[in-house]
Amino acid sequence: MAARRERTEWEVVAFLAFIGMSVAFGIDATLPAFDEMRPDVGLPPGSNRITLAVTVYFLGMAAGQVVYGPVADRFGRAPTLRLGMAIYALGATGSMLATDFGFLLASRLVWGLGASAASLMNLTILRDLYTGDRMA
């Protein structure tokens, strides 16, 4: 078995920044695409119902917070983050392939559930590694 090497502080910061960015990407990549998304999911031009895609994403994030904390305590940070990122990828792929509004909303909910693992594990890993002024 290969010996585990210590991660440099730069690698840890880059990793935490990446998983933090993935949470924002789920929202920021969607907002400018609303006009293009509407016809793809069967909504009329100018329909405000498309904004539910953001609302449902946040609902998924909120629901996931309740689940991932105990899962991380029981199974560990890395397996929980891997599970969450797999769910994130599933939701993002479903959102990309959605051809009706209901499927888009379901995919966005799944995407939000996955994103909540990234959000929660980002803070949890930070707290595990650093204390006090080192966290800033």
Functional labels for PLM-detected ranges:
Residues A62-G102:
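Conserved MFS/SLC helix-loop-helix module at the cytosolic interface between two early adjacent transmembrane helices
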Residues G42, G76, L97-F103, G114, ...:
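Helix-breaking motifs and short loop linkers at transmembrane-helix boundaries and internal kinks
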Residues L16, G20, A24, A92, ...:
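Helical-face signature of the major facilitator-like transporter fold
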